């Protein structure tokens, strides 16, 4: 190129980074494209993982450590305050830190725990130079952060991070998960039984609580079996505890895997007390109706006591699991047909603790795929729409867009299913058929209303006159258009009698066995009912059906209401 520079040219855009950050902050405030929620003191902070990881080394380690973190959408932390996290979030997205005398101590403490050195240096400088001097800045105001409150928060922060960094799957050999329920070879059954037997012995000896997969001991140190033989150990189930160390090590292990919500979100994953552990085990235990047949087998077994699956401890489940393993290894004549399914249930129960999942529910038809229901909010009316793909259809009700057009009469519709129903008017298609009389209908609700002629069902009733109707629009017309005189109709009205002689004299009274004819205002009321409600319609076979306004129609054929002259006094 003549007179130009040969080669690539780098053109800087100084405002590009600030524009990107501004766009991300706008997405955060509107809740768009946020892939993680930080829960602090009951407040939710939707945000982006990449932004937090780029700003905080603690969040970077939290989001990138362990395989279980790939499924994590919600993190609940209790070692920082909501006000401090709000200020740090604004700093991460706007590059501006807003501090005051009241919150500088909390922000400094949170910045140290979340490893944001720039904020820590600024807050420390403000306190040392007494630019923001407070009467009582608390433990966070100490330059070295050695206050008791900071030490407790630091311990909780390390404990929370350690839970996600120590993946129990990594400490177990692959053979530990080759159970019979997961397509393991038959020759591994003996090894599996020995491993579970050692686990049961450890539980019985009190060496572990049945769910302690997070002990501080290395994988090589394993507890001895119940027979006391040295060197005989359980391969990779419960690591040995140090007798001098406190229970659970430096960071007490979680009592149960973090519970998930409907959308796959996780709750708080911290240590809990013994009472909370019992509650967690009770909630995680399978329901009696969903549990396999091992409960009935336990009632018929050696103990003879009925087992209550609610609140079962892990040791009890392990012992019942061993019983199932023993039955699976016996001959086919002695083993029960559902032992294999029982074994699958136990193995899924305990493997769920390794994988960080909730305890699987019993299902004899196999595992079911759980699909998270999509919830979307309408930007116009803020109505929450449930179901993927339904939001555009809802928005058309606001915009008036009708993309689906009938190619015959050019009528347009907002929904394709409405167009499909409309086309039946042109094609004459009537897919809904009455099984009793053979009448065909184009709409499902027409068939539903027609079936009430056979069943006598009249679900819609006037509160004033107690008159009943087959269809809701008939009741609406009775109340709004024609008006209701408020005179209660006689219960069931007069029975309809087929073949009433036409020569019954007027004023001779009703035929024998019938109640007296209506008098005074009731006669006019019944006449209005007949004028308002009775509608004749031809069914698919050309027969005439007349729906009366009161009483139950007799099943078994069309009936015609008696005329006014039959009931005249």
From Swiss-Prot:
Q: Where exactly is the Glycyl lysine isopeptide (Lys-Gly) (interchain with G-Cter in SUMO2) cross-link placed along the chain?
A: 430, 527
Entry superkingdom: Eukaryota
A Pfam match is BTB
Q: Where in the sequence does UniProt note compositional bias of the Gly residues kind? A: 548-557
Please give the residue ranges the record annotates as the region Mediates interaction with KHDRBS1: 275-569
Listed Low complexity bias regions: 498-511
Where does the BTB domain start and stop, copy by copy? 34-101
What's one GO MF term for it? RNA polymerase II cis-regulatory region sequence-specific DNA binding
Residue ranges, annotated region (Mediates interaction with RELA): 343-569
What Gene3D superfamilies does this protein's entry cite? Answer: Classic Zinc Finger, Potassium Channel Kv1.1, Chain A
Q: Where are the zinc fingers (C2H2-type)?
A: 376-398, 404-426, 432-454, 460-484
Q: Mediates interaction with SMAD4: where is this region?
A: 371-569
> Which residue stretches belong to region Disordered?
214-306, 480-569
Biological process according to GO: B cell differentiation; chromatin organization; chromatin remodeling; DNA-templated transcription; double-strand break repair via classical nonhomologous end joining; erythrocyte maturation; fat cell differentiation; negative regulation of androgen receptor signaling pathway
Q: Which residues carry this modification: Phosphoserine?
A: 331, 335, 537
Question: Found in which tissues?
Answer: Expressed in osteoclasts and kidney cells.
Give me the Gene Ontology terms describing cellular component: cytoplasm; DNA-dependent protein kinase complex; nucleus; site of double-strand break
Which keywords does the record carry?
A: Developmental protein, Differentiation, DNA-binding, Isopeptide bond, Metal-binding, Nucleus, Phosphoprotein, Repeat, Repressor, Transcription, Transcription regulation, Ubl conjugation, Zinc, Zinc-finger
Subcellular localization is given as:
Nucleus
Subunit (UniProt): Homodimer. Interacts with BCL6. Interacts with RELA; involved in the control by RELA of the accessibility of target gene promoters. Interacts with AR (via NR LBD domain); the interaction is direct and androgen-dependent. Interacts with NCOR1. Interacts with NCOR2. Interacts with SMAD4; the interaction is direct and stimulated by TGFB1. Interacts with HDAC1. Interacts with SP1; ZBTB7A prevents the binding to GC-rich motifs in promoters and represses the transcriptional activity of SP1. Interacts with the DNA-dependent protein kinase complex/DNA-PKc.
Q: What does this protein do?
A: Transcription factor that represses the transcription of a wide range of genes involved in cell proliferation and differentiation. Directly and specifically binds to the consensus sequence 5'-[GA][CA]GACCCCCCCCC-3' and represses transcription both by regulating the organization of chromatin and through the direct recruitment of transcription factors to gene regulatory regions. Negatively regulates SMAD4 transcriptional activity in the TGF-beta signaling pathway through these two mechanisms.
Q: What is this protein called?
A: Zinc finger and BTB domain-containing protein 7A
Source organism: Rattus norvegicus
């Amino acid at each position: 190129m003549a007179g130009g520079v040969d080669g690539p040219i780098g053109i800087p855009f100084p405002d590009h980074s600030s524009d990107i950050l501004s766009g991300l902050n706008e997405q955060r405030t509107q809740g768009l494209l946020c892939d993680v929620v930080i829960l602090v003191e009951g407040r939710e902070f939707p945000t982006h993982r990449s932004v937090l990881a780029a700003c905080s080394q603690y969040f970077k380690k939290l989001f990138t450590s362990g395989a279980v973190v790939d499924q994590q959408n919600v993190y609940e932390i209790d070692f920082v305050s909501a006000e401090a996290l709000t200020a740090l979030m604004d700093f991460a997205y706007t590059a501006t830190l807003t501090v005051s005398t009241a919150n500088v101590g909390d922000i400094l403490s949170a910045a140290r725990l979340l490893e944001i050195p720039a904020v820590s240096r600024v807050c420390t400088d403000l306190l040392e130079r007494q630019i923001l001097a407070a009467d009582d800045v608390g433990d966070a105001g100490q330059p070295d952060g050695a206050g008791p409150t900071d030490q407790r928060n630091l311990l909780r922060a390390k404990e929370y991070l350690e839970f996600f960094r120590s993946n129990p799957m990594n400490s177990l050999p692959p053979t530990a998960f080759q159970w019979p329920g997961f397509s393991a070879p038959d020759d591994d059954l003996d090894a599996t039984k020995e491993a579970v037997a050692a686990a049961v012995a450890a539980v019985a000896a009190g060496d572990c609580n049945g769910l302690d997969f997070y002990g501080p001991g290395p994988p090589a140190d394993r507890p001895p079996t119940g027979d006391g033989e040295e060197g005989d150990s359980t391969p990779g189930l419960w690591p040995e505890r140090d007798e001098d160390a406190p229970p659970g090590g430096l960071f007490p292990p979680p009592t149960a895997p973090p519970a998930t919500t409907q959308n796959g979100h996780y709750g708080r994953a911290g240590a809990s007390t013994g009472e909370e552990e019992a509650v967690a085990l009770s909630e995680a235990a399978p329901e009696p109706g969903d549990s396999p047949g091992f409960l009935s087998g336990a009632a018929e077994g050696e103990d003879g006591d009925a087992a209550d699956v609610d609140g079962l401890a892990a040791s009890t489940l392990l012992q019942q699991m061993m019983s199932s393993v023993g039955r699976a290894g016996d001959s086919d004549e002695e083993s029960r047909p559902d032992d294999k399914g029982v074994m699958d249930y136990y193995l899924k129960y305990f493997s769920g603790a390794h994988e960080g999942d909730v305890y699987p529910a019993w299902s004899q038809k196999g595992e079911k795929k759980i699909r998270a229901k999509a919830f979307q909010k309408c930007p116009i009316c803020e109505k929450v729409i449930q179901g993927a793909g339904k939001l555009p259809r809802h928005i058309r009700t606001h915009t008036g867009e009708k993309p689906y057009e009938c190619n015959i009469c050019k009528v347009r519709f907002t929904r394709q299913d409405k167009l499909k129903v409309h086309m039946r008017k042109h094609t004459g298609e009537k897919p809904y058929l009455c099984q009793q009389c053979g009448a065909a209908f184009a709409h499902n609700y027409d068939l539903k209303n027609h079936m009430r002629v056979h069943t006598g069902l009249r679900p819609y009733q006037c509160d004033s006159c107690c008159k009943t109707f087959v269809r809701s629009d008939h009741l609406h017309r009775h109340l709004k258009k024609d008006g209701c005189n408020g005179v209660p109709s006689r219960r069931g009205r007069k029975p309809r009698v087929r073949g009433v002689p036409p020569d019954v004299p007027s004023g001779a009274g009703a035929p024998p066995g019938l109640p007296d004819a209506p008098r005074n205002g009731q006669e006019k009321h019944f006449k209005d009912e007949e004028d308002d409600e009775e509608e004749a319609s031809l069914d698919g076979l050309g027969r005439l059906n007349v729906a009366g306004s009161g009483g139950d129609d007799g099943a078994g054929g069309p009936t015609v209401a008696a005329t006014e002259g039959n009931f005249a006094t």
